[in-house]
Each structure stands twice: as structure tokens, then as C-alpha cells.
């Protein structure tokens, strides 16, 4: 079934930036700005790497994630799935 293979937007986004090693700027709910590349993630946290150091960031602390370059998550370059 197609529904079994479907991923949510968050997992699709994080998996894409992880595989492409896209640099990210992450803003936390307390205003702190983090930058780096996602090397791993699960339901509760992600591992952010920069300058040879890794940070474990809890997702509940994240406000906004901005990729450093334009990304296209879906075929055809559209922002909505078919």
C-alpha cells in the first residue's frame, strides 16, 4: 500500500538534508542559533555536526530549520506531493 511507504514531511525533509549534507541554520525556542549538518535523527532528537563537533539537539527545543541552499523534496520541483 502507498500509505505504508508514506513518510511525514518532517522525516522527508530531515532525510533529504542528511543525505545531501545540506548546511542548516536551526533556531531554538529560546532564540539560540545553531548551524551545521544533520548526521542522524529519530523521533525525538537530531545530531548536528559542525567543525568536527557533534551536538545532540532535542526536537522539542527547535523552533525553525532553514536550509543553507534551496531544496526540492518532491519530484518535479513542486512543494506539494502528487
From Swiss-Prot:
Listed GO MF terms: RNA binding
Pfam families per UniProt: Hfq
Protein keywords: RNA-binding, Stress response
Keyword set includes RNA-binding: yes
CDD domains: Hfq
BP GO annotations: regulation of DNA-templated transcription; regulation of RNA stability; regulation of translation, ncRNA-mediated
The organism's place on the tree of life at top rank: Bacteria
PANTHER family (UniProt xref): RNA-BINDING PROTEIN HFQ (PTHR34772:SF1)
Family from the record: Belongs to the Hfq family.
HAMAP family, sorted: Hfq (MF_00436)
Complex formation: Homohexamer.
Function comment: RNA chaperone that binds small regulatory RNA (sRNAs) and mRNAs to facilitate mRNA translational regulation in response to envelope stress, environmental stress and changes in metabolite concentrations. Also binds with high specificity to tRNAs.
Identification of the protein by name: RNA-binding protein Hfq
Organism: Afipia carboxidovorans (strain ATCC 49405 / DSM 1227 / KCTC 32145 / OM5) (Oligotropha carboxidovorans)
Gene that this polypeptide is encoded by: hfq
Amino acid at each position: 500500500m502507498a500509505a505504508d511507504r508514506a513518510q511525514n514531511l518532517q522525516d522527508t525533509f530531515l532525510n533529504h538534508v542528511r543525505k545531501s549534507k545540506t548546511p542548516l541554520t536551526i533556531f531554538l525556542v529560546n532564540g539560540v542559533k545553531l548551524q551545521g549538518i544533520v548526521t542522524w535523527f529519530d523521533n525525538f532528537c537530531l545530531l548536528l555536526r559542525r567543525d568536527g563537533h557533534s551536538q545532540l539537539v532535542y526536537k522539542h527545543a527547535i523552533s525553525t530549520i532553514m536550509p543553507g541552499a534551496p531544496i526540492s523534496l518532491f519530484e518535479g520541483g513542486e512543494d506539494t506531493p502528487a
